[in-house]
Amino acid sequence: WPNKIEPGK
């Protein structure tokens, strides 16, 4: 899912 640590994952 998209998150703030690794966007795009």
UniProtKB/Swiss-Prot annotation:
Keyword presence, Secreted: yes
Biological process according to GO: killing of cells of another organism
Secreted keyword on record: yes
Compartments where found: Secreted
Gene Ontology CC annotations of this record: extracellular region
Superkingdom, natural source: Eukaryota
Tissue: Expressed by the venom gland.
Alphabetically ordered keywords of this record: Cytolysis, Secreted
Free-text function comment from the UniProt entry: Presents weak hemolytic activity at physiological concentrations (micromolar range). Does not induce mast cell degranulation, weak lactate dehydrogenase (LDH) release from mast cells and antimicrobial effects. In vivo, injection into mice induces increase in nociceptive sensibility, but causes very reduced or no edema formation. It also causes no alteration in rearing (standing on hind limbs) and does not impact locomotion.
Record-given protein name: Cryptide Pep-6
